[in-house]
Amino acid sequence: MWPTSAGLIAGAVLDRLIPDPRRGHPVAVFGSAAARLEQVLYRPSRARGALFTALAVGTAAGLGAGLGAAVERAAGPTGRAAAASATAAATAGATWAALGGAMLAREAEAIADALESGDLDEARRRLPGLCGRDPSVLDEKGIARATVESVAENTSDAVVGPLVWGALLGLPGLLGYRAANTLDAMVGHRSERYERFGAASARLDDVANWAPSRLTALLACAAAPLVGGSPRRALRVTARDGDRHPSPNSGRCEAAFAGALDLRLGGTNRYGDRVEHRPELGEGRHPEAADIRRAVALARAVDAGAAAVAAAVAVLPALPALPGGRR
């Protein structure tokens, strides 16, 4: 439908133009509410975790559905055009709230600034804003790799995913997806506390990100020439290395970025007391500070491509059918 299509494009533009507020951002408000719900429901149980996930994501999706219905009712007597415009405006606002591409770029570029100025302590201080690795054990190249990998993964999670689900399901899809992704960040990681309770959130996020992660990888491969890369090499690396990552989705994104940027990602990661040894992705050199900016440029190209794809998908139901039932 064109109101959804227009709203997705407008929301993506707003994400670039309007900085996220320091306090009161809708995603942060949801996270606080989910944390309180966790305190009430927590038990080291898969069933309790599934209930927690269903309530939190269901509430967010329900709010999206309720907002859409309220907008249509409010514009009812004024005609179809007013209702469509109101739906587009509501979708734009929800898209802006759900997207995190501009914030991701700003955080990554701030780390690049710190590394390029020789301020390793500042780069370490900022890294936890992007990922959960222990920055105290990372040198400049380790921080550069962690940042590039986070840009690749979060481009799918924070931009492409919301746009895809917004195109498919409108406001409920936008808000429900962002809720699922937020819960995964909160309780979906491996730890003694969340091994069972977080299983449902982690699995839901895997399912919800299956299509967005693969679209992210394809768009990154297509945009490789914009950062001096080769689409053919990016596709080859993605096909060869995308399944080597522990995550069924993040591996696709990181492998595509590695191939497009001609870098080598992966290796040993430390998360507090836990150490993971991951296979290497790509066949180029190890990332440096300047490669963070290249990764951000690639992510911005992917963001734009995803917005265009989402807008096209959203408008498909409104296209006239061709003879034989085809559009």
Show which residues each predicted segment covers:
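Short amphipathic, positively biased membrane-proximal segments
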Residues: 1-327
